[in-house]
């Protein structure tokens, strides 16, 4: 065994290429779109204008693709992209269109968000009056 050298950490020698990661996030706007208070195509356009790549807006190139199927907006990224940043932009859109008081952004699962209405319980107020 004098010809072989032990490697630290048991990793293979040399630098290999990093595996290209593809991140895919969806935002489900079904409820507000069906009720007619929000336009999914307008939201898609907002994301295309506002998502920053390397500190610049409107710099999506081929790294980030935004697609819309009916009322679901999908953001596919080849570069590092935060799901939290997508939530931030969604909330910014809701605030801009005065929808922030009625809608909230909820994580449906690891890769998607959903726009839901706030639950307002009027039954509690009626019980307090008694």
UniProtKB/Swiss-Prot annotation:
UniProt keyword annotations, A-Z: Ribonucleoprotein, Ribosomal protein
Cystines in this chain: none
InterPro entries: Ribosomal_eL22, Ribosomal_eL22_sf
Ranges that cross the membrane: none
Pfam families: Ribosomal_L22e
Region (Disordered): 1-21
One GO term (biological process): cytoplasmic translation
A single GO molecular function term of this UniProt record: structural constituent of ribosome
GO CC term (a single one): ribonucleoprotein complex
Motif (Nuclear localization signal): 17-20
Family membership noted in the UniProt record: Belongs to the eukaryotic ribosomal protein eL22 family.
Protein's recorded name: Large ribosomal subunit protein eL22
Annotated organism of origin: Tripneustes gratilla
Phylogenetic lineage: Eukaryota, Metazoa, Echinodermata, Eleutherozoa, Echinozoa
């Amino acid at each position: 065994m004098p010809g072989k050298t032990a490697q630290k950490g048991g990793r293979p020698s040399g630098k290999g290429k990093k595996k290209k990661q593809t991140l895919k996030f969806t935002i489900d706007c079904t409820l507000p779109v069906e009720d007619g208070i929000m336009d999914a195509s307008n939201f898609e356009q907002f994301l295309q204008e506002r998502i920053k790549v390397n500190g610049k807006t409107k710099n999506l190139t081929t790294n980030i693709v935004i697609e819309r199927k009916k009322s679901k907006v999908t953001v596919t990224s080849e570069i590092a992209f935060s799901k939290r940043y997508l939530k931030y932009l969604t909330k910014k859109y809701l605030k801009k269109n005065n929808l922030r008081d009625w809608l909230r952004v909820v994580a449906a699962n690891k890769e998607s968000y959903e726009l839901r209405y706030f639950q307002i319980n009027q039954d509690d107020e009626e019980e307090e009056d008694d």
